[in-house]
Protein backbone atom coordinates (compact mmCIF):
# COMPACT_ATOMS: atom_id res chain seq x y z
CA UNK A 1 0.00 0.00 0.00
CA UNK A 2 1.30 3.53 -0.78
CA UNK A 3 1.57 4.42 2.94
CA UNK A 4 4.88 2.49 2.99
CA UNK A 5 6.63 4.93 0.66
CA UNK A 6 8.38 6.89 3.44
CA UNK A 7 11.97 5.57 3.44
CA UNK A 8 14.49 5.09 6.24
CA UNK A 9 17.15 7.26 4.59
CA UNK A 10 15.94 10.44 6.30
CA UNK A 11 17.71 13.25 8.16
CA UNK A 12 15.75 12.55 11.37
CA UNK A 13 16.59 8.82 11.33
CA UNK A 14 20.26 9.58 10.72
CA UNK A 15 20.33 11.84 13.78
CA UNK A 16 18.65 9.17 15.93
CA UNK A 17 21.03 6.31 15.04
CA UNK A 18 23.36 6.71 18.08
CA UNK A 19 20.51 6.76 20.61
CA UNK A 20 18.76 3.83 18.89
CA UNK A 21 21.93 1.73 19.08
CA UNK A 22 22.27 2.50 22.79
CA UNK A 23 18.68 1.54 23.65
CA UNK A 24 18.02 -2.10 24.54
CA UNK A 25 14.35 -1.69 23.59
CA UNK A 26 15.04 0.32 20.45
CA UNK A 27 14.55 -0.64 16.81
CA UNK A 28 18.23 -0.80 15.78
CA UNK A 29 21.08 -3.16 16.65
CA UNK A 30 24.51 -4.00 15.29
CA UNK A 31 26.63 -7.14 15.36
CA UNK A 32 29.92 -5.45 16.16
CA UNK A 33 31.99 -8.13 14.41
CA UNK A 34 30.28 -7.04 11.18
CA UNK A 35 30.98 -3.31 11.58
CA UNK A 36 34.05 -3.17 9.28
CA UNK A 37 32.02 -4.66 6.41
CA UNK A 38 29.16 -2.22 7.03
CA UNK A 39 31.23 0.98 7.02
CA UNK A 40 31.02 1.52 3.20
CA UNK A 41 27.26 0.90 3.33
CA UNK A 42 26.81 3.32 6.24
CA UNK A 43 28.80 6.03 4.45
CA UNK A 44 26.56 5.69 1.40
CA UNK A 45 23.50 5.73 3.68
CA UNK A 46 24.66 9.05 5.17
CA UNK A 47 25.08 10.51 1.67
CA UNK A 48 21.53 9.37 0.80
CA UNK A 49 19.91 10.79 3.96
CA UNK A 50 19.49 14.37 2.74
CA UNK A 51 16.00 15.78 2.30
CA UNK A 52 16.44 15.78 -1.48
CA UNK A 53 17.53 12.12 -1.62
CA UNK A 54 14.80 11.12 0.83
CA UNK A 55 12.11 12.66 -1.38
CA UNK A 56 13.62 11.07 -4.49
CA UNK A 57 13.27 7.65 -2.86
CA UNK A 58 9.80 8.42 -1.48
CA UNK A 59 8.42 9.55 -4.86
CA UNK A 60 9.80 6.53 -6.70
CA UNK A 61 8.59 4.08 -4.06
CA UNK A 62 5.17 5.73 -4.08
CA UNK A 63 4.87 5.15 -7.83
CA UNK A 64 5.57 1.43 -7.59
CA UNK A 65 3.59 0.94 -4.37
CA UNK A 66 0.57 2.51 -6.05
CA UNK A 67 0.66 -0.40 -8.51
CA UNK A 68 1.29 -3.14 -5.92
CA UNK A 69 -2.27 -4.06 -4.96
CA UNK A 70 -3.61 -4.07 -8.55
CA UNK A 71 -0.76 -6.42 -9.49
CA UNK A 72 -1.74 -8.74 -6.64
CA UNK A 73 -5.39 -8.61 -7.69
CA UNK A 74 -4.47 -9.91 -11.15
CA UNK A 75 -2.92 -12.99 -9.56
CA UNK A 76 -5.57 -13.36 -6.87
CA UNK A 77 -8.29 -13.57 -9.53
CA UNK A 78 -6.88 -17.00 -10.41
CA UNK A 79 -6.62 -18.60 -6.95
CA UNK A 80 -8.93 -19.27 -4.00
CA UNK A 81 -8.04 -16.84 -1.20
CA UNK A 82 -10.96 -17.39 1.14
CA UNK A 83 -9.95 -16.30 4.64
CA UNK A 84 -6.34 -15.59 3.70
CA UNK A 85 -6.41 -11.82 3.05
CA UNK A 86 -8.17 -9.20 5.16
CA UNK A 87 -8.94 -5.60 4.16
CA UNK A 88 -8.99 -3.89 7.55
CA UNK A 89 -6.26 -1.31 7.13
CA UNK A 90 -3.16 -0.78 9.24
CA UNK A 91 -2.69 1.36 12.35
CA UNK A 92 0.49 3.25 13.30
CA UNK A 93 0.71 4.51 16.88
CA UNK A 94 3.33 6.43 18.87
CA UNK A 95 3.90 7.95 22.28
CA UNK A 96 4.81 11.59 22.92
CA UNK A 97 8.51 11.11 22.10
CA UNK A 98 10.07 11.81 18.69
CA UNK A 99 6.98 13.67 17.51
CA UNK A 100 9.00 15.56 14.88
CA UNK A 101 9.73 12.26 13.11
CA UNK A 102 6.05 11.38 13.08
CA UNK A 103 5.16 14.84 11.77
CA UNK A 104 7.72 14.45 8.97
CA UNK A 105 6.27 11.08 7.94
CA UNK A 106 2.74 12.52 7.85
CA UNK A 107 3.94 15.53 5.84
CA UNK A 108 5.70 13.33 3.24
CA UNK A 109 2.62 11.15 2.80
CA UNK A 110 0.43 14.23 2.44
CA UNK A 111 2.73 15.54 -0.30
CA UNK A 112 2.51 12.19 -2.08
CA UNK A 113 -1.29 12.12 -1.85
CA UNK A 114 -1.53 9.10 0.46
CA UNK A 115 -4.91 8.77 2.16
CA UNK A 116 -4.32 8.84 5.91
CA UNK A 117 -6.54 9.43 8.91
CA UNK A 118 -5.02 11.01 12.01
CA UNK A 119 -6.50 9.32 15.08
CA UNK A 120 -6.53 10.41 18.72
CA UNK A 121 -6.40 8.25 21.84
CA UNK A 122 -10.15 7.63 21.91
CA UNK A 123 -10.24 6.62 18.25
CA UNK A 124 -7.27 4.28 18.69
CA UNK A 125 -9.09 2.64 21.59
CA UNK A 126 -12.20 2.21 19.43
CA UNK A 127 -10.13 0.55 16.69
CA UNK A 128 -8.02 -1.66 18.99
CA UNK A 129 -9.41 -1.79 22.56
CA UNK A 130 -6.89 -4.39 23.79
CA UNK A 131 -3.85 -2.12 23.34
CA UNK A 132 -2.55 -0.71 26.63
CA UNK A 133 -3.01 3.02 27.10
CA UNK A 134 0.56 4.20 26.46
CA UNK A 135 0.03 5.91 23.11
CA UNK A 136 -0.23 9.61 22.28
CA UNK A 137 -1.74 9.51 18.78
CA UNK A 138 -1.64 7.58 15.53
CA UNK A 139 -2.44 7.30 11.85
CA UNK A 140 -4.88 4.85 10.28
CA UNK A 141 -4.46 3.73 6.65
CA UNK A 142 -7.84 2.25 5.76
CA UNK A 143 -6.99 0.65 2.40
CA UNK A 144 -4.06 -1.49 3.53
CA UNK A 145 -4.46 -5.27 3.54
CA UNK A 146 -2.75 -8.03 5.46
CA UNK A 147 -2.20 -11.73 4.88
CA UNK A 148 -3.55 -14.21 7.41
CA UNK A 149 -1.11 -16.88 6.24
CA UNK A 150 1.57 -15.79 3.73
CA UNK A 151 2.90 -19.33 3.27
CA UNK A 152 -0.49 -20.67 2.14
CA UNK A 153 -0.83 -17.81 -0.34
CA UNK A 154 2.67 -18.42 -1.66
CA UNK A 155 2.00 -22.14 -2.16
CA UNK A 156 -1.20 -21.36 -4.06
CA UNK A 157 0.72 -18.98 -6.34
CA UNK A 158 3.43 -21.60 -6.79
CA UNK A 159 0.83 -24.17 -7.86
CA UNK A 160 -0.56 -21.63 -10.33
CA UNK A 161 2.95 -21.11 -11.73
CA UNK A 162 3.36 -24.86 -12.29
CA UNK A 163 -0.10 -25.19 -13.88
CA UNK A 164 0.82 -22.46 -16.36
CA UNK A 165 3.86 -24.44 -17.46
CA UNK A 166 6.50 -23.07 -15.11
CA UNK A 167 9.38 -25.31 -14.08
CA UNK A 168 11.17 -25.28 -10.74
CA UNK A 169 14.65 -26.52 -9.85
CA UNK A 170 16.20 -26.00 -6.42
CA UNK A 171 19.96 -25.97 -7.04
CA UNK A 172 23.03 -24.16 -5.77
CA UNK A 173 24.53 -21.90 -8.44
CA UNK A 174 28.32 -22.04 -8.28
CA UNK A 175 29.21 -19.72 -11.15
CA UNK A 176 27.83 -17.71 -14.06
CA UNK A 177 29.53 -17.71 -17.45
CA UNK A 178 28.41 -16.73 -20.94
CA UNK A 179 28.11 -18.55 -24.26
CA UNK A 180 27.57 -16.12 -27.16
CA UNK A 181 26.25 -13.60 -24.61
CA UNK A 182 23.73 -16.12 -23.26
CA UNK A 183 24.00 -16.70 -19.49
CA UNK A 184 25.35 -20.12 -18.51
CA UNK A 185 24.62 -21.14 -14.92
CA UNK A 186 26.84 -23.79 -13.38
CA UNK A 187 25.78 -25.97 -10.46
CA UNK A 188 27.81 -28.72 -8.79
CA UNK A 189 27.24 -31.20 -11.62
CA UNK A 190 25.07 -29.48 -14.24
CA UNK A 191 25.02 -26.45 -16.52
CA UNK A 192 22.00 -24.51 -17.77
CA UNK A 193 22.00 -22.03 -20.65
CA UNK A 194 19.27 -19.43 -21.10
CA UNK A 195 18.41 -16.66 -23.54
CA UNK A 196 17.90 -14.33 -20.60
CA UNK A 197 18.02 -14.73 -16.82
CA UNK A 198 16.85 -12.82 -13.75
CA UNK A 199 18.79 -12.71 -10.49
CA UNK A 200 16.15 -12.37 -7.78
CA UNK A 201 17.75 -13.92 -4.71
CA UNK A 202 17.05 -11.23 -2.14
CA UNK A 203 19.94 -10.53 0.21
CA UNK A 204 21.86 -13.44 -1.34
CA UNK A 205 21.92 -11.79 -4.77
CA UNK A 206 25.22 -10.04 -4.07
CA UNK A 207 27.13 -13.33 -4.23
CA UNK A 208 26.08 -13.61 -7.88
CA UNK A 209 26.37 -9.95 -8.88
CA UNK A 210 29.91 -9.81 -7.49
CA UNK A 211 30.79 -12.64 -9.89
CA UNK A 212 29.55 -10.40 -12.71
CA UNK A 213 31.88 -7.57 -11.65
CA UNK A 214 29.01 -5.33 -10.60
CA UNK A 215 29.72 -3.88 -7.18
CA UNK A 216 26.18 -3.23 -5.99
CA UNK A 217 26.07 -1.95 -2.36
CA UNK A 218 23.57 -4.58 -1.25
CA UNK A 219 23.52 -5.69 2.37
CA UNK A 220 20.94 -7.08 4.76
CA UNK A 221 18.74 -5.72 7.52
CA UNK A 222 18.22 -8.72 9.75
CA UNK A 223 14.63 -8.87 11.01
CA UNK A 224 13.04 -11.10 13.65
CA UNK A 225 9.64 -12.48 14.50
CA UNK A 226 7.93 -14.58 17.16
CA UNK A 227 4.40 -15.94 17.43
CA UNK A 228 1.96 -15.94 20.33
CA UNK A 229 -0.43 -18.77 19.56
CA UNK A 230 -4.23 -18.43 19.90
CA UNK A 231 -4.03 -14.67 20.56
CA UNK A 232 -5.09 -13.28 17.19
CA UNK A 233 -8.41 -12.14 18.69
CA UNK A 234 -6.55 -9.38 20.55
CA UNK A 235 -6.07 -7.29 17.39
CA UNK A 236 -8.22 -6.66 14.32
CA UNK A 237 -5.43 -5.44 12.02
CA UNK A 238 -1.66 -4.90 11.97
CA UNK A 239 -0.51 -2.34 14.53
CA UNK A 240 2.90 -0.66 14.31
CA UNK A 241 4.49 1.06 17.32
CA UNK A 242 6.67 3.60 15.54
CA UNK A 243 8.91 4.59 18.46
CA UNK A 244 10.25 1.07 18.94
CA UNK A 245 10.11 -0.06 15.32
CA UNK A 246 8.01 -3.20 15.70
CA UNK A 247 4.56 -4.37 14.67
CA UNK A 248 2.02 -7.04 15.58
CA UNK A 249 -0.23 -8.74 13.04
CA UNK A 250 -3.18 -11.08 13.74
CA UNK A 251 -2.72 -14.26 11.69
CA UNK A 252 -3.89 -17.86 11.52
CA UNK A 253 -0.87 -18.85 13.60
CA UNK A 254 -1.72 -16.31 16.31
CA UNK A 255 -0.13 -12.91 16.81
CA UNK A 256 3.03 -12.41 14.79
CA UNK A 257 5.38 -9.88 16.37
CA UNK A 258 7.92 -8.59 13.86
CA UNK A 259 10.50 -5.88 13.72
CA UNK A 260 13.82 -4.36 14.60
CA UNK A 261 16.72 -3.81 12.24
CA UNK A 262 19.96 -5.60 12.99
CA UNK A 263 23.05 -5.13 10.85
CA UNK A 264 25.09 -8.31 10.97
CA UNK A 265 25.26 -9.92 7.55
CA UNK A 266 24.07 -13.33 6.45
CA UNK A 267 26.26 -15.60 8.56
CA UNK A 268 25.99 -14.39 12.15
CA UNK A 269 23.72 -16.47 14.42
CA UNK A 270 20.31 -15.36 15.64
CA UNK A 271 20.47 -12.81 18.48
CA UNK A 272 18.51 -13.92 21.53
CA UNK A 273 18.55 -10.32 22.75
CA UNK A 274 16.52 -9.29 19.70
CA UNK A 275 13.97 -12.05 20.40
CA UNK A 276 13.70 -10.89 24.02
CA UNK A 277 13.28 -7.35 22.74
CA UNK A 278 10.29 -8.38 20.60
CA UNK A 279 8.67 -10.31 23.46
CA UNK A 280 9.13 -7.37 25.82
CA UNK A 281 7.68 -4.94 23.28
CA UNK A 282 4.67 -7.18 22.62
CA UNK A 283 3.88 -7.30 26.33
CA UNK A 284 4.40 -3.55 26.57
CA UNK A 285 1.66 -3.15 23.97
CA UNK A 286 -0.78 -5.89 25.00
CA UNK A 287 0.03 -6.90 28.58
CA UNK A 288 0.21 -10.56 29.64
CA UNK A 289 0.72 -13.03 26.80
CA UNK A 290 1.33 -16.80 26.76
CA UNK A 291 4.71 -18.37 26.06
CA UNK A 292 5.99 -17.41 22.62
CA UNK A 293 6.99 -19.88 19.89
CA UNK A 294 8.55 -19.98 16.42
CA UNK A 295 11.62 -17.76 16.80
CA UNK A 296 12.66 -16.64 13.33
CA UNK A 297 15.38 -14.58 11.66
CA UNK A 298 15.08 -13.27 8.10
CA UNK A 299 17.18 -11.13 5.81
CA UNK A 300 15.83 -7.93 4.26
CA UNK A 301 17.90 -7.00 1.19
CA UNK A 302 18.63 -3.29 1.42
CA UNK A 303 20.62 -0.63 -0.39
CA UNK A 304 21.75 2.70 1.09
CA UNK A 305 19.17 4.71 -0.89
CA UNK A 306 16.36 2.23 -0.05
CA UNK A 307 15.42 1.79 -3.69
CA UNK A 308 15.26 -1.73 -5.20
CA UNK A 309 17.46 -2.85 -8.07
CA UNK A 310 15.26 -3.70 -11.06
CA UNK A 311 16.41 -3.88 -14.64
CA UNK A 312 19.22 -5.08 -16.90
CA UNK A 313 22.80 -5.53 -15.79
CA UNK A 314 25.13 -2.75 -16.91
CA UNK A 315 27.69 -5.32 -18.02
CA UNK A 316 25.58 -8.13 -19.51
CA UNK A 317 22.50 -7.33 -21.59
CA UNK A 318 20.85 -10.73 -21.04
CA UNK A 319 21.06 -10.62 -17.23
CA UNK A 320 18.33 -8.78 -15.33
CA UNK A 321 18.12 -7.91 -11.65
CA UNK A 322 15.19 -7.83 -9.26
CA UNK A 323 16.20 -7.50 -5.60
CA UNK A 324 16.77 -4.98 -2.82
CA UNK A 325 13.15 -4.35 -1.80
CA UNK A 326 14.15 -4.01 1.90
CA UNK A 327 10.99 -4.24 4.09
CA UNK A 328 8.64 -4.47 1.11
CA UNK A 329 9.59 -7.66 -0.71
CA UNK A 330 6.26 -9.39 -0.07
CA UNK A 331 4.33 -6.25 -0.99
CA UNK A 332 6.22 -5.55 -4.20
CA UNK A 333 6.74 -9.09 -5.50
CA UNK A 334 4.01 -9.22 -8.18
CA UNK A 335 4.50 -5.71 -9.56
CA UNK A 336 8.28 -6.16 -9.63
CA UNK A 337 7.91 -9.39 -11.59
CA UNK A 338 5.55 -7.65 -13.98
CA UNK A 339 7.96 -4.73 -14.51
CA UNK A 340 11.03 -6.91 -15.08
CA UNK A 341 9.21 -9.34 -17.37
CA UNK A 342 8.03 -6.33 -19.37
CA UNK A 343 11.62 -5.17 -19.71
CA UNK A 344 12.71 -8.60 -20.91
CA UNK A 345 9.91 -8.67 -23.48
CA UNK A 346 10.81 -5.12 -24.61
CA UNK A 347 7.40 -3.86 -23.58
CA UNK A 348 6.78 -0.33 -22.33
Predicted feature residues:
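Glycine-rich FAD pyrophosphate-binding loop
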Residues: 1
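Active-site substrate-recognition segment that forms the wall
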Residues: 4-48, 175-178, 182, 191-317
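Rossmann-like flavin
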Residues: 38-156
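Surface-exposed helix-capping loop/turn segments at secondary-structure junctions
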Residues: 74-86, 163-167, 194, 214, ...
Amino acid sequence: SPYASVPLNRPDVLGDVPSMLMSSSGPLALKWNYLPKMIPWFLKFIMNSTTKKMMHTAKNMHQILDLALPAYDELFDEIDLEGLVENKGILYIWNDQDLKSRELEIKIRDELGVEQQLVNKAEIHDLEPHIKNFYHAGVFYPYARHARNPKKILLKLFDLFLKKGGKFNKLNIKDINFDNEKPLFKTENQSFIFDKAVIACGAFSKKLTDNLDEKIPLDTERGYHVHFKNCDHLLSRPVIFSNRGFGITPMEQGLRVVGTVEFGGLNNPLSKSRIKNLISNAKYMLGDLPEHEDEWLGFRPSLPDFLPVMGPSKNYKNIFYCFGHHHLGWTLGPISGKIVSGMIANEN
